């Protein structure tokens, strides 16, 4: 189905910079997210007919409700999307609209960058569709403003068509998903549902209830600096030790060499001097045993290096971030089976596969609300090559509407 307000709503959202900040200690991590919630989303929620709208400054969540209009539909279902965007320029987003894409190169404004099927063969799946791209200087923000727009559009449609019977619905728009802390303070008592869905997936048909289990690894290395001309048997180069540590991690256990259910170590920043060096990693895996083994391996590696050095110079701090929500959701597959049935009714092929990442649903599921993830449409997310299909967004709205009518 087509929804006349969907595209305009999405374009309005993405033009607002809501980039999160991992260095911040506030909630939300950036004021722009709270402003977006209070000055854009909250008035719109009121205008389209949501009730019991509340913004909680303690956790950054904006919540609203739409009561059931049928006694036959007894479930209470939630839909969740996040307001922040990833760690890439989000100031001055200028979307391009490519109507009826016919294939080939899409120039991204005057940036000198292009979307090419040779680099991004997923483009070939969108022939004839309306694509929204960046101008090459920013990300787009379809992750996850497409999800927000889809939820809003579905609610607007239900209120405008009261003859459509639906269950109790709650919606929540939250902060800081991209920096991994958005759901830490989620208030399950304020979100009284049987189960929920994050609308935060990628291409058409994605339906996910498995995520990585995740940990952060901080490496600190202490060296000893002396003049390089007289350094023999005296200098201890912290940068070299950090490189030695990294070189002992399995060479094939990296993001660029893994897929499916394979885990990895990912070095995402390194800095330092001869005197002191730091490196930051993320650790990811699906199975508990593999996840624990990865964490134990880096701890043991540091101990072995210190033993060889004869001093405590290599320090690792491992902090768990979130866990695979499969262990919660597989206890009752109702939310997955319901979404799957709705997709099949709509002739959408469900693509049920693990998320090689996490969602707010990872943490919310462990708080007691099973929360699988549904496609929102974004492709090539988190950078200048991000794009989304309007037709996929429309189908996401269709799925939301189907779920609340089938609950």
Curated annotation (Swiss-Prot):
Pfam families assigned = M20_dimer, Peptidase_M20
Record-annotated residues binding Zn(2+) 1? 82, 143, 200
Q: Which reaction does it catalyse?
A: Release of the N-terminal residue from a tripeptide
Family annotation (Gene3D superfamilies): 3.30.70.360, Zn peptidases
- Leading EC class: hydrolase
GO terms for CC?
cytosol
Instruction: State which Enzyme Commission number(s) the record gives.
Output: 3.4.11.4
InterPro entries membership: ArgE/DapE_CS, Bact_exopeptidase_dim_dom, Peptidase_M20, Peptidase_M20_dimer, Peptidase_M20B
Q: Which PROSITE patterns match?
A: ARGE_DAPE_CPG2_1, ARGE_DAPE_CPG2_2
Report the active site residues. 84, 177 (proton acceptor)
The subcellular location is: Cytoplasm
Q: Which residues bind Zn(2+) 2?
A: 143, 178, 382
| GO MF annotations, alphabetized | metallopeptidase activity; tripeptide aminopeptidase activity; zinc ion binding
Task: Tell me which cofactor or cofactors this protein depends on.
Answer: Zn(2+)
Q: Name one GO biological process term.
A: peptide catabolic process
Q: What's in the keyword line of the UniProt record?
A: Aminopeptidase, Cytoplasm, Hydrolase, Metal-binding, Metalloprotease, Protease, Zinc
For this chain's record, the cofactor binding note is: Binds 2 Zn(2+) ions per subunit.
| UniProt xrefs under PANTHER family | PEPTIDASE T
Function of the protein: Cleaves the N-terminal amino acid of tripeptides.
What protein family is recorded?
Answer: Belongs to the peptidase M20B family.
Know the name of this protein? Answer: Peptidase T
Q: Which organism is it from?
A: Streptococcus equi subsp. equi (strain 4047)
Gene expressing this chain: pepT
